[in-house]
Amino acid sequence: MLMFTKGPKALAFVAVIGAGVLLAGVSGRAQLASERFSMVKAMTFDVFGTVVDWRSSLISEGQALSTRFGFEVDWAQFADDWRGGYGPAMQRVRSGELPWMRIDDLHRMILDDLIPKHGLTPLGEEDRDNFNRAWHRLQPWPDSVSGLTRLKTRFVLSTLSNGNVALLVNMAKHSGLPWDVVLSSELAKHYKPDPEVYLTAADLLGLEPEEVMMVAAHKGDLRAAAALGLKTAYVPRPTEYGPDREIDITPDPTFDIVATDFNDLADKLGIR
């Protein structure tokens, strides 16, 4: 039987014991997670919004144009409009209205439509092309590089984005993203969340779907992956659409892991 007396030393002893129990609990949970996902060999990542902050990056690129040309443009609205055209443009391809197109080409099509609406007609072809390549220069979230570097010590890391291969390779070089491989919906000639994208990725990695974990900030992406047997990690990015827009980040209980960022994801998988 242990006897405790009141006083500073006794309280300090209890605090130390309590901290030890807490650390043991955290370590134990990480160990259980590590064992639970021992079959996972690779992690595939959504990129736009999950790994990189597209909105702030596009705003910054637009502001640079304003400095050069004197444009008076609401660049936050422009970024939202550019991104907002992405889904409808993909649907036009899916419906057969448009032939298969790389995301670079879809982005340019949307940009050409937005230019007169936002008073950017003075932009010449070279500047338009360079502005379209802003999507190749998107900046990562603060935790992305450090978290991916930790996850890379255990898993094969790959993109799995609707962005085309050249875009993703250039982005990785620009932002120092430590991918082992760059996979894209372009390789399946489908866009997420079509099943072909996820299954093609697993096949190219030489893995079964259950040996792959899809990581994304978007629930629809994860639900589509889970339906095919992939493991799922939900990493919400509450400010993806700006600080003033509220988005539902309530996790789906069917997701295998929920993390606040990539370093938290590494912690929960027992990676130090």
PLM-predicted stretches and their roles:
Residues M1-A15:
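Bacterial N-terminal signal peptides that target proteins for export
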Residues M3-K6, Q31-V40, T149, G163-R272:
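Asp-based, Mg2+/Mn2+-dependent phosphohydrolase catalytic module
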Residues A12-A24:
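Bacterial N-terminal signal peptides
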Residues V26-R29:
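Sec/Tat signal peptide C-region and signal peptidase I cleavage site
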Residues E35-G84, K117:
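Active-site neighborhood of HAD-like aspartate-dependent phosphohydrolases
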Residues D46-G49, L111, T159, A225:
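Generic structural signal for small/hydrophobic residues in well-ordered secondary structure
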Residues F69-G70, A79-D129:
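A metal-dependent, Asp-based hydrolase signature
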Residues E125-H174, V182-S185:
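Substrate-recognition element of Asp-dependent hydrolases with the DxDx(T/V) motif
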